[in-house]
Amino acid sequence: MTHPPFLYGTAWKDERTAPLTRLAVEAGFRGIDTANQRRHYFEQGVGDALEGLYREGSVTREDLFLQTKFTYAGGQDHRLPYDPHADFPTQVRQSFASSLEHLRTDYVDAYVLHGPSVGRGLSEADFAVWKAMEALCREQKARVIGVSNVNLGQLRLLVEAAEIPPRYVQNRCFAANYWDREVRALCSERGIVYQGFSLLTANAQVLGGPEMVALARRYRKTIAQLVFRFAQQVGMLPLTGTTDINHMREDLASSTFDLTDDEVRLIESVGAS
């Protein structure tokens, strides 16, 4: 399936993951982002929620866009979804099989490398993991593949080396660097969809400024709705992890109005010094 206009992020919800995932789907979200990283996610909780919704007939698997991730051992706690002594292709296979079991599915719509193993450049491990993910994609167990927490140089290296290029890039998005403009530009050039997370929490200090407040009043929208609409209008696929049902509904309503080109430029530069 093609991706929906919004993704619901399930990080840092622990035992509330299942009820909040259910709430999000009932509110109208059709895209769910998770990871097989028990340290920050409870992937099985997502599956528990979906199993109940499927059983009730509220949605079908085909209605949903499910995205999960492979996370290196350095980003995990002791609850690893694979043998840390195995080679990287085996770790990917084991983690992926565990994800399918957690999510009660035989495929995922997007499988994402949670982040490179090094801060600069890409390692042999990264290339080995990517090849394993490409194999899952060829088998159609992962419809597409992507990468998260990546800088411009790393993304360039990956797209040049990959046989199957990333369909998605998911990054924390800071207004201070024009909402990751350089990475977004490369994504646009290469036909990659940019997913932005922490759009609100990473930018709280600048989003309460007078320009944003005035714009919110003009449209009678919340600051969050302005940010998410801006994101959509610049070609971004935004994530929200709100736990509030009213905020869920407001976030989904972000696509009901359009900002002018000047207003888009204003928001794009709101955090730049």
Language-model features, listed with the residues they occupy:
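Active-site mouth loops of central-metabolism enzymes
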Residues: 3-16, 78-90, 118-124
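Acidic (Asp/Glu)-rich catalytic clusters
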Residues: 23-26, 47-65, 100-106, 137, ...
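N-terminal binding-site loop/beta-alpha segment at the start of enzyme catalytic domains
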Residues: 1-68, 128, 132, 202
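Active-site groove signature of glycoside hydrolases
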Residues: 100-121
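Structural motif corresponding to the early beta-alpha repeats
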Residues: 57, 61-89, 114
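A structural motif
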Residues: 29, 105-108, 142, 166
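Short, acidic/polar
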Residues: 13-25, 85-103, 153-156, 178-179
